[in-house]
A protein has these predicted regions:
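Conserved class I S-adenosyl-L-methionine
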Residues: 1-44
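Class I SAM-dependent methyltransferase "Motif I" SAM/SAH-binding loop
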Residues: 56-58
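Class I SAM-dependent methyltransferase SAM/SAH-binding core
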Residues: 61, 65-99, 104
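Short conserved loop adjoining the S-adenosyl-L-methionine
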Residues: 109-114
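A short SAM/SAH-binding and catalytic strip from SAM-dependent methyltransferases
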Residues: 119-131
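A short, conserved alpha-helix within the catalytic core of class I
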Residues: 129-139
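Conserved beta-strand signature within the Rossmann-like core of class I S-adenosyl-L-methionine
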Residues: 144-153
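Short alpha-helix
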Residues: 176-194
Length: 215
């Protein structure tokens, strides 16, 4: 991981306070629209009995919803421990503690320690990681069937907005950076690991992309 994004920087952005806020919103309103788009697509592909690996899943809401929809087990890999307590509370409330394995590590750097799954999800994760090919390649290698990813669209206004955000983070001396990795490179990297695109759905900010393991 580059010097721009240290564990300290991630913990400042993805804090315990942020986790509690996300959990409160999920309990009241359910999934946000981008996460719902992921769930809706996965359901069309068949989720019954499938295993799920989510990298950077935060409070674990997507995992919970897929397990409720029929997935057999889920694996969660988080870069920082700040979401673990709240995620555990949500699992206990849903009665799903024994069906989710949670761990804290840099997935891209320690992917060999993580089991593969039928469905792998990277929701709003690629834009927070400097080494896109390493992260995307590791995720693709772990996807036995489907890889779902979301990342910001490369519009002019997002480039300006995120650029200003990065300047502000630098001025505040926060060790964090937001990346607008080229979507074509993200998809090409996945293709190098045996996956074929099956979905490219653009929202106002986020693109939802899905790739399937080639036959």
């Amino acid at each position: 991981m580059s010097d721009c994004c240290s564990p300290k920087g991630y913990r400042w952005i993805f804090s315990e306070r942020s986790a509690r806020s996300e959990a409160k919103r999920y309990r009241r309103k359910g999934l946000d629209s981008t996460s719902r788009r992921i769930i809706d697509f996965v359901k069309t592909q068949g989720v019954e009995g499938k295993t799920v690996l989510e990298v950077g899943g935060g409070i674990g809401a997507i995992q919970i919803e897929l397990l409720k929809a029929g997935a057999s087990r889920a694996i969660s890999v988080e870069l920082t421990p700040t979401y673990e307590e709240v995620a555990g509370e949500l699992l206990r409330e849903a009665g799903l503690v024994d069906r989710v394995d949670r761990s804290v590590m840099d997935f891209a750097a320690a992917a060999e320690r993580v089991s593969s799954a039928d469905i792998v999800i990277l929701n709003r994760v690629i834009c927070c990681y400097p080494d896109m090919p390493r992260l995307t390649g590791a995720a693709a290698d772990h996807a036995r069937r489907l890889l779902l990813m979301t990342y910001p669209r490369r519009t002019w206004w997002l480039r300006i907005g995120l650029g200003l955000g990065n300047v502000l983070l630098w001025l505040m001396r926060r060790e964090f950076h937001i990346f607008l990795h080229p979507p074509s490179q993200i998809i090409a990297t996945s293709g190098e690991h045996g996956l074929e695109p099956v979905l490219d759905e653009k929202g106002f900010i986020w693109t939802v992309a899905a790739l399937r393991r080639a036959a």
